[in-house]
Amino acid sequence: MTTATKPHQGRFRYLTRGSQPTPSKEAYLLPSLSEFGDIVTLPLTDLRPSLDLGQDSPYKLDVHGFTARRHDSALHSAPYSRASWNNEKLLRQIYFPEVEEFVKNVTGCKKAVVSAAVVRNRLYSEGDDSAPAEEEADTQASSSDDTSHMFPPIFGNSVKDGVCPAPKVHLDCTPKGARHHIRRYHSEVALAAEKVIEAENRLLESGVEWNDLKDHSGKVPHFALFSIWRPLKTVHRDPLALSSAASFPVSDYVPCDQREPTDHSIPSHLYRIVGRDDENIDKNDDTYQTQSYLAYAPRDAEKTSHAWHYISEQQPSDVLVIQLFDNEMEGHARAPLEGGKGKSDLGVGGAVHSAFELVDQDEDAEARESIEVRVAAFW
């Protein structure tokens, strides 16, 4: 007699349905955890069987908004150790180039630009209302060398300035947020995106609305934003889960304004937002307004419409590829109506995700340790 496998389940924190979140005034931060008051236990699918399938994986970036791969780093082998992942010089010289090549191999893009990294090594504190969400950082890491001015920024790479996961179901950028990001975040990203921005601006100046750019994707070069996420030791608590964009209903997306750092050295023809009066921009303001998605909990009877996935006991070589936005996917993918009764007009280009609490996880286990690298990709 075979023993049935115990189903995977996790507890997720959503906005209370009908509530409108209060945006954080701080760069990167999502609203306070107190606003995520709807705690729901939901089923999960394990991605582990797909790790070695490569391009044959059933999880497709242009369908689900995520995939998973097995990938080793040079930092996993001697003479390097766990401490090497807190060494900014090694991350910049070894790991970031590895990630850029990895993204090229997985997606086929021609250029990949690492834009930020976050190392997490702290337990989440229930009382920390300003704790950052899964793809956020609450502080610039300190080190013996002043690297705060360097690009890409690295957050949380010291014990003193550690960053923790926080269970807030979200997607880091709406389509408009992604387009503002490539224009306003940093000159290296904006310059890499120059052809994209110029093509979109021509459409916008011809009268196309921002929300209708999805209907003109064939006239704009392909670009995407990714988060490449791996643990630094086996994950026993507070894993990261991904929700399938193919089934996440339009009624559960909640747009929310957010702040990001800005770079005033970006050339003006790339920095400007067509259709907005930017003449009175405060050049002393170090942030700009962008937009993310938060979410309401699923309402279907089986609670499966969000189709959550994770990697059980995720190892350092088990890598999650999280698509935050892809303009080519947005050109054809539409969020389904609730109950699967057809498609809405909302273009989707990425996967909602969150740190979560595994049912029956060991609450005495050490803090999860992970590194996330943000990448802008261009074809």
UniProtKB/Swiss-Prot annotation:
Pathway it acts in?
A: Pigment biosynthesis
Source organism superkingdom: Eukaryota
Organism of derivation = Gibberella zeae (strain ATCC MYA-4620 / CBS 123657 / FGSC 9075 / NRRL 31084 / PH-1)
Task: Give the EC number(s) under which this enzyme is classified.
Answer: 1.-.-.-
The entry's function note states: Oxidoreductase; part of the gene cluster that mediates the biosynthesis of the yellow pigment chrysogine. Pyruvic acid and anthranilic acid are likely substrates for the nonribosomal peptide synthetase chry1/NRPS14, with pyruvic acid adenylated by the first A domain and anthranilic acid by the second. If pyruvic acid and anthranilic acid are merged and released from chry1/NRPS14 by hydrolysis, a subsequent amidation would lead to 2-pyruvoylaminobenzamide. This process is probably catalyzed by the amidotransferase chry2 using glutamine as amino donor.
Name the residue ranges with Acidic residues bias.
126-138
Q: One GO MF term, please?
A: oxidoreductase activity
Protein name (record)? Oxidoreductase chry3
Q: Which UniProt keywords apply?
A: Oxidoreductase
Which InterPro entries does the entry mention? Answer: AsaB-like
Give the family from UniProt.
Answer: Belongs to the asaB hydroxylase/desaturase family.
Q: Where is this region: Disordered?
A: 1-23, 126-150
